[in-house]
Amino acid sequence: MPTFGSAVSRKLLPVLLGVLVLAGPARARQTTEFAHVVARLSEPGGYFDSDNLVSNETSYLHVLPALRTLDLHGGAYVGVGPEQNFSYIAELKPAIAILIDIRRDNLLLHLLFKAMFEVSRNRMEFLCLLYGRPAPPVLARWSDSPLEDILTYLDITPGDSAIQSRNHSELMDRVTRFGVPINDSDRVTLRRFHDEFYAQGLEITFTSRGRPSRPGYPTERSLYLATDLEGHPGSYLSTEDRFRTVRDLQRRDKVVPVVGDLSGPTAMKAIGAYLKEAGLPVTALYVSNVEMYLFRQGSFPRFAENVRALPGAPNGVLIRSYFGRGMLWNGGGPVGASPLPQVQPGQLSAQQLQTFPAFLQLTQHPDSLSYFELLTNGVVELRQPPRPRRQRRRRVRQPA
């Protein structure tokens, strides 16, 4: 079963206790600072009609080759939603990641993920904690295993409710020590979220409240195994190195969940001020398809203003997604059904990259901008043209 520490001999116990005493105050200071940053950057939350435990974007990894071409890495990453952010973080390797969402539930989910990352020695232990499975006897043997083998282990290993309850209790003890205020209602929500992963396993999908589920939403399994446009796996669990990139940031309190509205009056501006103080430019801002909702409710101009408050890197980008061909919005009205750029066959969603300079140029007069115009101007080509083959010169034999 997953454990949070290894057995120690009695001879080593006094030494270990001494180390813990020395480490305790330092950890407490870090935790206090983590909670302080969460509070400083947050604003009152709002409502959205979904749990968003997992992403609904089948195309979320399609931007990875273009991110590599742009040579984006380091700086600060800002993103919305649940764990698809971890895959972007694994690719970009930022110094800090700030995860903003209008739903306080998203902050709670990320606190649970943080606890799991901090105690997990590898991907196998992380997934066993998430899905309530007993961990294999020798965890270290799984560190170099293909992700497919790890998922097969989860498939053939039944969940254990006693292990799930024990793990959740220990994880909640750690969540409490982060210093972010957690009330009884939050604890109920966290247990419900964790139990959803336990009950549905790798087949868990995005769910909405009050509207029918859209066919074709990806399962968590398919999101883990997704590939980029070049056919390469790219999720944060695809390799142990990518997992460790995220885990190490989590252990250093550098993945900060924040409650806030992208078009709100406080959180985005507070994030901008905090990153300016730290001297960290934003290399990537992931907004999912939130802009569509902002156009619908007339708050996109405030979002554009908030983006201007961020210290964007000169080659930094917005990462966005959009869904469907005929359900796009132009200030509240549907746009035509013609295919848009970056749509890939068989995909429920499409991803886009847009550089900060292009976005800022396009949104100089946001009140007169349509969602369709936003999606069709100044976007980065995701598919790089193939390099021409070098022709080999034929050697002509000289007559003897």
Predicted regions and their residues:
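Bacterial N-terminal signal peptides that target proteins for export
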Residues: 1-14
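Bacterial N-terminal signal peptides
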Residues: 11-23
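Boundary at the C-terminal end of the N-terminal hydrophobic targeting segment
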Residues: 26-28
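Conserved alpha-helix/loop element of class I SAM-dependent methyltransferases that forms part
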Residues: 54-72
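Conserved class I S-adenosyl-L-methionine
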Residues: 72-83
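Conserved SAM-binding loop of SAM-dependent methyltransferases across substrates and taxa
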Residues: 84-92
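Class I S-adenosyl-L-methionine-dependent methyltransferase module
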Residues: 98-256, 365, 371, 375-388
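Alpha-helical subdomain
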Residues: 201-397
